[in-house]
Every structure is written in structure tokens, then in C-alpha cells.
Amino acid sequence: VKINANIGTSPHDISLEKEQAKLAAALEYGADAVMDLSTGGYWVEIRTALLGQCPAPFGTDTIYQVMTEATSLDDVKADDLLDMVHHHAKQGVDFVTVHCGVTRAALPLLAKRVTGVVSRGGAFLTAWMRRYGQENPLYEHYDRLLEIAREYDVTLSLGDGLRPGCLADATDKAQLHELKVLGELTRRAWAKGVQIIVEGPGHLPLNAIQKNVRLQQKHCSGAPFYVLGPLVTDVASGYDHIAGAIGGALAATLGAAFLCYV
């Protein structure tokens, strides 16, 4: 089992020195990979500096930069999402999160959710699809993503844009619809020689973790499962690191390959 540590700026706290300190701490305490999830600042300069100092695999979520640089949905075209993946790959990152499994077919399945879409990337893409009446460009033009990934030897981390944000939404139709799409995309990537990680929930009750790991292994043909937690309770605000450690420990024993600390 491998551990990923997230670092990154916010619009109100932009400091290369702070990010370098976070990176050093993550590596000191044994992180196997690091993701820069910055949402503000001088992107290229910070990412270049961190890449130069990080011996571990280094990942990004490209849609964060698209979202932050745009002033509204009207500013974001399909090519912008694909071009940003190319930009990050060309800069030298090892893996990128891409929310390719959020499709128009899943939108009606969200109606009865308690907490809706809690993933930043997922929320952005659902809003984009509703605004334009078009399919998710990362799904529609997936072959272009595969070409980029193969050219730059980048692993695609297929994001769980419809992950449940509370226990009541766990393993619902929207989550499972996305998981099945990610399985299809996994096999298409393998056929093109592209490596894949499949991201997973999210908020899950303790007794649903085994089922979710088994479902991922089934639908995604055993691709490495990268889980955010899972968080096993909704009533531990401020203590997500504890709830996530409990869920992550169980998920790891059941076959999850990659844990994202929270």
C-alpha cells in the first residue's frame, strides 16, 4: 500500500516557501507520492520548483488551475480542459487526476442526493455540462487524453467526481454509474499502453468499505484503487484525519493500493 500527501496553495495563501516546507515534511514522514492541488498563485513557477525538489512521483489535478483562472463558466471551452492536461504533462508531472467518468447520463441520478456533488472537479464539470448542454470533454475526447499520457509517460488518475459526500449518499446510483464508466475507460487506456489509477470515495460507512473495494476490483479489472479516506462518519468535522485513518486502514487490508491522507 502506498500513501499520497496533498500540498498546495490557496487564493489567499500563496507562498513557495510554505509549499516547499510541506513537501519536505511529507517526504520526511514517508509519503510515497505527492500531489500539488494549488488553487492560486504563480502556478508554473511553484510547480517547477516543487518538481525539481521532489524525488517521489508528483501529481496534479489539472482542472483546479482551469477553474481558478476562469472568471466564469463562459470562459471555459472544451479545448481548455484538454490543453491544461497537456500543459501539466509537458511540464513533467508523473500523474494527473482527470474527471473523465462524470457524464451527462449521470446527471439525473444526482437529484435525490443529500449533499450533491462534493468533488471540486465533479461540481465544475456537472455545472459546465448543464451550462453548455454538451458531454464532458474529458470523456468525449478521452482518446486525446490517452495520446497525451502516452507521449509524456503520464499515469492517468481517473477521478471520482461523483464520490459521496456523506454516508447517506454512499454507493448510490450516481457513484456506481461513474465507477462503471471508469472501468470502461481503464480498459481503453490499457489497450493504448497508458497506466491507470482509479480514485474512489469518499464518505462510506465502515460496513460498506469491503463492498466498495470489491465493486471497484470487479468493474475496473483490478486496476489500482486510490481512496480518499474513506471517511467513516459525517460527525467528525475537524477530525477527518482520524476518520480517514480508520477507513483507510480497513480499505488497505481489503485491497486498496493507494491511500490519500486527509
Located regions from the model:
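Alpha/beta enzyme core
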Residues: 1-233, 239, 244-259
